[in-house]
Amino acid sequence: MSKIDIQDNFLNPNYFKNLKNLFLSERVNWTYSDVISYENELSATKIDNFQFTHMVYFDDAPVSPHYNDLIDFINEIKVASTCKIKVNMNPKTDKIIVHGFHNDMVYKCKTGILYLNNNNGYTIFEDGTKVESIENRFVSFDSGMKHSGTSCTDQRVRLVININYFEPELHK
């Protein structure tokens, strides 16, 4: 099994609070996304398979006015090159919905998730490993590991920042 790295209290508390407040504010425009998992077999029914997204970085360029707000986050990860940054907002549901296992990227890189709020949703991996949604927790793993996000039932939304990136090469 590939390694899943979990780091709690990942960002400076004041910076994290500002980031969380930004993405919970009306200053951010959200896009409705009809499909969460790109696999043919979904755990969620079609009616439950949606989320709201805010693309921050895509196709080798910032695509959001909020990209600069994430610079300290990117630097904390020690990113050599960014592939994609997207903020996902999953609305509350009556029961936890597992949206379907997927890989974010088709090539080998790292996937990272920063949890912006506490809720009873989670990230689950194909091997059954669950990572709870705890605010200011950062989880990273090889992009080849299939995973799924969920909805939550105890908060209005489940909010995460998803980043796909290349790590710097280690020099001896």
Each PLM stretch: what is its role?
Residues M1, R27, I124, I163-K172:
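Double-stranded beta-helix
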Residues M1-A80:
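Non-heme Fe(II)/2-oxoglutarate
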Residues Y67-D72, K78-N103, Y107-T111:
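Internal catalytic-core helix/loop-beta-alpha segment
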Residues K95-G100, Y107-C109, Y115-I134:
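A short beta-strand-loop-beta hairpin characteristic of the jelly-roll/cupin
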Residues G100-F101, K146-D154:
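Short beta-strand His + acidic residue motifs that chelate non-heme Fe in jelly-roll/DSBH
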Residues G112-L114, Q155-H171:
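A short hydrophobic beta-strand segment most commonly corresponding to one strand
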Residues V131-S148:
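Conserved metal-binding segment of the jelly-roll/cupin
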